[in-house]
Amino acid sequence: MVGVSNWAAPSTATPVHATVTVPGSKSQTNRALVLAALAAREGSSRISGALRSRDTDLMIGALETLGLSVAASDSDPADLTVSGTLAPAAEARVDCGLAGTVLRFVPPIAALSAQTVTFDGDEQARSRPIAPLLDGLRTLGVDIDGDGLPFAVRGTGTVAGGTVEIDASGSSQFVSGLLLSGAAFTDGLTIVHTGDSVPSAPHIAMTVSMLRDAGVEVDDSAPDRWRVSPGPIGARDWVIEPDLSNSVPFLAAAVVSGGAVRITGWPTVSIQPADTILKILAGLNGEVRKGSSYLEVQGATNYGGIDVDLRDVGELAPSVAAMAALADPGSVSRLRGIAHLRGHETDRLAALSTEINGIGGQCEETEDGLVITAREMHGGTWSSYADHRMATAGAIIGLRVPGIEVEDIGTTAKTLPDFPQLWADMLGGQTDDLQQGPSARETPGR
């Protein structure tokens, strides 16, 4: 890739001991931005602790293209105020980049405008699934030109709403994208999922929870069916949690090195899949300690393979695959329920298999996942495929395999700005007695 140099992943032969603070949740930030935009007719909304990354800045840019104002505080760029009116200029164009949330959450908003809005993005984004969402909007009476990027939404100022059947087995974002705008449709919205099980279901639960927080009535009592009643979306203050999925590479450093890493600001109760993350880490012999405002993982001196269904948390698959590849030699791990990752930023299953095998590991694709047999690996180039989670997986492996060079580490800016510096700080700020402190013993548990 022109202009992109490889990043020498730092290695350590000793346990990692560190305290890390990760920025806000991308998923929660972009949902809050969308809900604040839809609530602008009711008043201004404030978002505190917002993630500022490529994906969230693309969302901000998209909403500004649609006529909204998203203003950052002079003192804190993570403190945002959303106001204004949905009034895109003629021939407005939204850049989706490689952000699935922009690609799938913003077209329904554009349909509520009175202009034609064109959507495009990075070259890799053109292969990401979008047809189920566009077909769903067409069922609701929206005029759309195209079946993939670039496409144009011809807004008329209103969307009638009603019932739509879609196959969301390729991405939960098809459901979330429609749900977020559904209350603004004249008759509200009923979504019926018709395909295989929906992946990343906790993300739909996050959408429903945030809609309810904004005063929207949502009925999700029946499996694979969601009903959003028509009505105002309330302007309010949103407080964004730390991004727990982005904490996993740092917690993985504790697992693979036998050290202890503490994440500050870990929520006591979360709308993210916190419990699933902790179960995975415990399954890799990590000891989990929770306090009132942190989470700490203590790695063991050794750990074996794991058999885990990642359907609900597919975004964790690259990190889990990296930990599996570094397990005790001969250990076998099975990562299941992640066939949908073939349609993410890249085909993550093929990418993980290629990269792990390329440095001497053993990784085989299955119909819905990966089988990884831990073997001694060697240094080499780890390609990121412009995928932030592939890049962080390479960093995890590099901790224990000297000579790993990650191609295009800058792609981590998609959701985790300054990742290389955060990673270096983690390794540079060793704290050997984390587990001995009084706060670390507040609420021990697994």
Curated annotation (Swiss-Prot):
3-phosphoshikimate binds at K26, S27, R31, S171, S172, Q173, S200, E315, H344. Coiled coil: none annotated. Its EC number is 2.5.1.19. Phosphoenolpyruvate binds at K26, G100, R128, Q173, R348, R389, K414. Keywords: Amino-acid biosynthesis, Aromatic amino acid biosynthesis, Cytoplasm, Transferase. One of its GO terms (biological process) is aromatic amino acid family biosynthetic process. Catalyzes the transfer of the enolpyruvyl moiety of phosphoenolpyruvate (PEP) to the 5-hydroxyl of shikimate-3-phosphate (S3P) to produce enolpyruvyl shikimate-3-phosphate and inorganic phosphate. This is 3-phosphoshikimate 1-carboxyvinyltransferase. It catalyses: 3-phosphoshikimate + phosphoenolpyruvate = 5-O-(1-carboxyvinyl)-3-phosphoshikimate + phosphate. The active site is at E315 (proton acceptor). It is found in: Cytoplasm. GO terms for cellular component: cytoplasm. One of its GO terms (molecular function) is 3-phosphoshikimate 1-carboxyvinyltransferase activity. Monomer. The keyword Cytoplasm applies. It comes from Mycolicibacterium gilvum (strain PYR-GCK) (Mycobacterium gilvum (strain PYR-GCK)). Belongs to the EPSP synthase family. It holds the Pfam family EPSP_synthase. It is an enzyme of class 2 (transferase). Pathway: Metabolic intermediate biosynthesis; chorismate biosynthesis; chorismate from D-erythrose 4-phosphate and phosphoenolpyruvate: step 6/7.
